[in-house]
């Protein structure tokens, strides 16, 4: 146990415990049209929430993920995070127009 604590402290990148019933892995973020960021995540434990999508990042294929959603992050609260956990959210309209590879991806606003 002491070894894991020392290792965690030495790495300075240990993840916080998940505080929410829905767990996601952050893929990347893009500037949002109205300010803030759109955070693209893969939902790890609630498969009915996202869509299987092949995503592009800066014009290049980033990968195919099973349960993609976009989290609206107007205050950049989730900058530099590897995962986002939450229980309450509002679902916004799915992406339309713009990048065709993103069409239909559900958008969420996390309410904690």
Regions found by a protein language model. Give the residues of each.
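Short, cysteine-centered beta-strand-loop-beta hairpins and adjacent loop/turn segments enriched
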Residues: 47-54, 93-94
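Short nucleic-acid-contacting surface segments enriched for D/E, G, S/T with interspersed K/R
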Residues: 64-86
């Amino acid at each position: 146990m002491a070894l894991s604590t020392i290792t965690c402290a030495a790495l300075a990148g240990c993840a916080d415990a998940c505080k929410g019933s829905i767990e996601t892995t952050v893929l990347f973020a893009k500037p949002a049209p109205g300010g803030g960021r759109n955070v693209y995540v893969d939902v790890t434990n609630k498969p009915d929430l996202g869509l299987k999508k092949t995503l592009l990042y800066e014009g290049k294929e980033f990968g195919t993920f099973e349960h993609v959603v976009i989290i609206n992050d107007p205050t950049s609260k989730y900058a530099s995070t590897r995962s986002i956990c939450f229980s309450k959210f509002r679902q916004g309209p799915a992406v339309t127009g713009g990048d065709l590879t993103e069409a239909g991806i559900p958008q969420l606003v996390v309410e904690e």
